[in-house]
Amino acid sequence: NKVTILFNEYIKIEDATNKVVVSPPQLEVPEIKAVGKKIVVELNDTLKPDVTYTIDFSDAISDNNEGNPLGNYTYSFSTGERIDTFEVSGTVLNAEDLEPIKGILVGLYDDLSDSVFKTKPLQRVSRTDSRGHFVIKGVAPGTYRAYALQDASGDYYFNQMSEAIAFSHQTFEPSCKPDIRQDTIWRDTLHIDSIIRTPYIHYYPDDLILMAFTHEQTNRYLIKTERQEPNQFRMYFSYGNPEIPRIKGLNFDSDNAFLIEHSAKRDTITYWLRDTTLINQDTLRMELQYLISDSAGVLVNQIDTIDALPKVFYEKRMKERQKEIDKWMKEQEKLRKRNKSYDSIVPVKPLEPHWVNASTIDPDKNVLVSFSTPLERLDTSMIHLYVKVDSLWYRAPFEFGPKDSIPRTYELRAEWREGQEYSLEVDSAAFCDIYGLASAASKQGIKVKTNDEYSSLFVKVSGINDNKLIVQLLNSSGGVVKQVRPHGGTAEFYYVTPGKYYLSAIFDANGNGVWDTGDYDADRLPEGIYYYPHVIECKAKWDVTERWNVTEIPRTQQKPAALVKQKADKEKKLQNRNAERAKKLGIPIPDEYRW
């Protein structure tokens, strides 16, 4: 079970655990070490009869002096009378954003049943490189299915829901044929010597695409409880549930003690303390009853005792507050001695609304306002909106109410007319929080931009059922600026701020308006994501029209390079260094180092 590979110079091996892949996979980790001019690989598993073994070193081997990698070196041997030589290659992408996934395990089964991925180790394996590309070598003739696995448990099959996986319904038979490729011979790092036609064996399939995803976390458990601020504590769950946890105070009265907020998915729950006495109490001990998943995934009742402690204790907060008061009193005393106006009562800070989009606004957006604490009361009769027509101000109709799924955020909706000026005037005490703090009076102008400041973008989509499509306009960082559903084959984007943009699309199979991950047990692939491969420049006053055949090019080539975060390693530079070194040593350049 020991393999020794000899070299003509001293070598070293880097990160063998992650870079070197033995196939068939070894459940007992092989021992791999470099000793002088040789590499010794000791396989601790019992070798299987009549099987081709491959030891893929990737770029782990390099010379000891200059660190030039050998690159893409694989050692093969067989325990039978023949060596299987077929190869299968392709790419693994993140299903949610088409990012190449580096270092994920990719493997094959000739057992085509769905259960095999959850019961038996992969038969032949490889790992992806920085481009998400993989090559599985030493494959025997047969019919296969390919899988990818972020193997957290190290057992080469899918047994943890938190593991990223990929699967495909496609089956294939490996094959090969003679082919010709064009290779470049470099004179040096800048100049090409010649381009030659090199015969080689082309292995198929070479274009497998696997979309990796992580299952939606449905096992429910309490992640943590924290009390960052003295007036609230927050519970984080792995998965939401409509039933809110029940709390029984052990050292305080919990009846009507809280105002409860929850996130859209109900996986984060915030309890605001109503009573000042509880806010000033450093330790809140409580009995918490909530639903948790048992080992079978069934929701059962769980009872825990929890202590909620603030980040800063009451005594320290009071000392800091006293320092602020002392500083204020000294300032007032200075004013008094100078015979200037001063106060004798420490002012109470008003409730401060945080207005968003309140000075300049797009015609298709609304003004938002958020608060740091929950409101007890708001009076819309104390909110006034005026529009300027010619030189006169007139009342403008509006609606004011909570913003969906965003706690403590409200939306001022109105018919914002392009180029118009508005005045938003709020009377004092229009807003009052649960602690009795009231807002001060405020007045601010709102300017609606003109149509001449925008571009319009029309995207004519084809190649896919556009009734299920959501087209997204992306900024230079890949963030979603706008999203629409196409109508009559055209996605229409209005009021686009001038700039450079990209496009992506979701094939919304279930019509819920968001991307959904896959489910292996349900044999459901993740919903499709697509990218328009070119940048789009939108200029003010321009109507831009683009045609996009969503499925025209493979998804491995769709995502614009500017948006790809997982950048490919500089393989060309490394191979050039090997070519230069071979030239210095006066030896022929091996085919695998020609670019």
Language-model region placement:
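N-terminal targeting or signal-anchor segments and their processing/structural boundaries
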Residues: N1-W595
